[in-house]
Regions:
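Hydrophobic/aromatic-rich core segments of domains that either
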Residues: 1-100
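Short Pro-Gly-centered beta-turn/loop motif in secreted/extracellular proteins
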Residues: 49, 157-179
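Beta-strand-rich domain onsets/edges
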Residues: 92-119
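A short, amphipathic beta-strand motif
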Residues: 118-130, 211-217
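Short, acidic Ser/Thr/Gly-rich low-complexity loop/linker segments typical of extracellular
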Residues: 144-159
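Structured interaction patches on ligand/partner-binding surfaces of diverse proteins
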Residues: 176-204
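Compositionally biased low-complexity segments at domain edges in trafficked proteins
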Residues: 198-226, 231
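Trp- and acidic/polar-enriched beta-sheet ligand-binding modules for extracellular glycan
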Residues: 225-250
């Protein structure tokens, strides 16, 4: 707290401590992976007298309706203290990815996606390897050079159905062999408005491109916090003695 630093997860934990100390019910919702970045995201929620979800997240101190969250998210979960027994029964004792082995969460995607909430239905035609009926298949989002599972379903005869999802993401399907994810499809775009997917199949021809930004600049919180910041240099790895190299004025 004194350093005013930390991740969104740590900030959400702090808000929970403060709210509960004041007698106000509060918890944490999260995306296992953002659709527009390479990291998960956590924030706080509370419920009004009608059971509607209101949220707050850094740096906005105001509370707003959950449906107003614009971030591409695919899936949203709510941290719980007890096991989600519905998911436990669905697993039927099968080998699961560690992220879903002990489901201490509730799926609240529909609360956030509202009218855009839909089941993602994928034909088995896009699977590039053999998957058997009853196998667990994961819907994954990317994180830098890897993939992270954010939802799972059981493979039926000729299709996969991931319940309660929102689009505007790039995903991929995978299975889990007990040690690592095994990719089972080409990456694909998942459109939020239509619910359709489009495979991103590698082409034989290559094209050179120039990238000017490492991350998108839209609503970049780092930019807003730069003024007043400094770049420092030091010969000491602990920075006990440091020189200011540059001061950010604007």
């Amino acid at each position: 707290v004194s350093w005013r630093a930390g991740s969104c997860h740590e900030f959400a934990d702090l808000v929970v401590y403060v709210m509960r100390a004041l007698g106000i019910p509060c918890g944490t919702d999260y995306m296992a992976m953002r659709g527009d970045n390479n990291v998960p995201h956590f924030w706080n929620f509370t419920l009004d007298k009608d059971g509607k979800t209101y949220i707050t997240e850094f740096p906005d101190p105001n509370w707003k309706r959950a449906v107003s969250m614009y971030n591409p998210k695919a899936k949203v979960y709510r941290n719980t203290y007890g096991l989600n027994w519905k998911d436990v029964k669905r697993q039927q004792g099968k080998m699961m990815h560690p992220a879903f082995r002990k489901p201490l969460y509730q799926d609240v995607t529909a609360v956030y996606a509202d009218s855009l909430n839909r089941d993602l239905v994928v034909s088995s035609d896009i699977l590039c390897k053999e998957v058997h009926k009853g196998d667990i298949v994961y819907f994954c989002l990317s994180t830098r050079m890897d993939w992270v599972p954010i939802a799972w379903t059981v493979f039926e005869e000729d299709s996969l159905r991931f319940q309660d999802t929102e689009g505007s993401v790039i995903g991929c399907l995978a299975t889990w062999n007990g040690k690592r994810l095994v990719m089972q499809s080409e990456p694909f775009t998942y459109d939020k408005m239509s619910g359709t997917i489009a495979l991103l199949t590698p082409q034989s021809e290559k094209e050179d491109i120039t990238l000017y930004f490492k991350f998108p600049l839209f609503c970049d919180l780092g930019i807003l916090r730069m003024p007043g910041g400094v770049f420092e240099g030091s010969n000491d790895s602990q920075f006990r003695s440091a020189d200011t190299l540059y001061y950010v004025k604007q």
